[in-house]
Amino acid sequence: KIVNVGVMMKGKGFMDKNMNVGMKDFRPEQMKVERILHEEFPDLEIRLEFPVNNLKIDGHPCAGAVLDIAILGYKVAIRMMGEIHQWSKKSRVKDQYQLYALEEAGWQVIDFIKDEFPAVWNRSKKEVKLNEAKEEVLDRLRKEKVAFL
């Protein structure tokens, strides 16, 4: 079951042009990973842009997080880490802080870093590229020993 929750905001006052037909604005790499997961594991409850609140680090409240992809039931958080996460020191600090908070809340956090998953970020619709992306995703999940494998 796939339930899309939330809209990625692109600035103050942003209104998704697709809202009137119930579509959301998600990044292509995010939708590709979600589609692979749904095709391979149709029984998973997958959410995009899933908010997680009431997080703590060492017992102290901290900011909530919006997960790029959440696999509910197994509490697997997938973060799509594009270029800004690599070159921005602030983003790296925020990401590490968020990682600690999510892990403390019982989430298994898996990062898909752009440079390590070129087929996932590749915009080609060719079957060979889509199969490469599928292998990248499944290899990473096996490496992380996710519970649903």
Model-derived features: where do they sit?
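Nucleic-acid endo/exonuclease domains
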Residues: 2-149
